[in-house]
């Protein structure tokens, strides 16, 4: 399993809750992440959405968690509670060169959210943006259901 492998390869990793005081560390990490990924329109839209979420972190009552190794943020996840049953995992970023980082931040963030909001029943992991690898990863979590996504222009 990816998490077990990550723990073996990175025994000194830590988690840290994202706060307004350390949010800049996530901004710095995601900037580095975008530097090594090929630009496309979806990436640009995601980048804008993440920037807005950072700007309004407190106002929209977001939660976040970072994975840290040797003082460096190697992954983070952020989301917000939708209602008493649903939680929306809005963003998850990790360095893909670090085996298991995505699986580990997913697991640790899910555990944090389950502890903070024990009444929750569903985590919305959002859509796969048409990326086959992301779809495969999200389907590996055996979702309860998949919803159709629609765009509306006003």
Which residue ranges define each predicted feature?
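A generic secondary-structure signal
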Residues: 5, 32, 56, 112-116
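An alpha-helix initiation/capping motif
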Residues: 20-27, 44, 128, 132
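Aromatic (often tryptophan-rich) hydrophobic motifs at membrane interfaces
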Residues: 63-154
